[in-house]
């Protein structure tokens, strides 16, 4: 859910800041459009390569990296002293958004019990919408902070990123499916047991193992 909120906050957070950014860096309309649109370019790159990284390093590690990118990009945008700096951090923000669009649904589908999987994936999508709404609310509340209000607007996702990172480190286990795929069965059992007890282990583990075996045969 945190990932969805950050997705929405980063997509919409700049909307209330565009006029101030244009004045701050004396941008033309096309230059301002480039600054705003480059987040989408970062999204494309992030979405393209995240799948490979999640298979190699694990879902949790990629989400931690994504949370760090959210923090760096948000505070980097807020502290930008030039349009070039702003562009660089906007692209980083896009990388995080693109990565989240891939890894968050993947993680939820692999760790949630079957009976609640669809609901949780839908909740992640709903969180994106909530993030967009929150971005507009924060922009409205911060508009009165004067000349540097745009910096505060762009910093907002950074604070949510810190919370996301703390939750990831403390609360979120690795995907049991990824653990199984990397010959770490005992750890996968522990994760499933911590989520739903022995009943979930009995229900999910055989299905995961049979799916992985089928995929390995297909790859051959």
Task: State where each predicted segment sits.
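Transmembrane-helix signature of 12-pass secondary carriers
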Residues: 1-220
């Amino acid at each position: 859910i945190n990932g969805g909120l950050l997705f929405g906050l980063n997509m919409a957070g700049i909307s209330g800041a565009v006029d101030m950014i244009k004045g701050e860096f004396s941008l033309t309309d096309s230059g301002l459009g480039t600054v705003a649109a480059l987040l989408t370019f970062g999204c494309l790159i992030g979405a393209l390569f995240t799948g490979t990284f999640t298979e190699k390093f694990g879902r949790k590690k990629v989400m931690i990296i994504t949370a760090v990118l959210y923090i760096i990009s948000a505070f980097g945008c807020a502290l930008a002293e030039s349009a070039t700096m702003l562009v660089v951090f906007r692209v980083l923000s896009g990388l995080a958004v693109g990565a989240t669009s891939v890894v968050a649904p993947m993680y939820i589908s692999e760790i949630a019990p079957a009976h609640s999987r669809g609901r949780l994936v839908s909740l992640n999508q709903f969180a994106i919408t909530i993030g967009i709404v929150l971005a507009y609310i924060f922009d409205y509340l911060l508009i009165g902070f004067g000349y540097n209000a745009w910096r505060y607007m762009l910093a907002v996702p950074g604070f949510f990123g810190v919370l996301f990172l703390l939750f990831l480190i403390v609360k979120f286990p690795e995907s049991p499916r990824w653990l199984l795929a990397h010959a770490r069965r005992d750890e996968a059992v522990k994760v499933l047991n911590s989520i739903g007890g022995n009943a979930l282990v009995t229900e999910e583990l055989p299905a995961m193992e049979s799916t992985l075996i089928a995929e390995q045969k297909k790859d051959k």
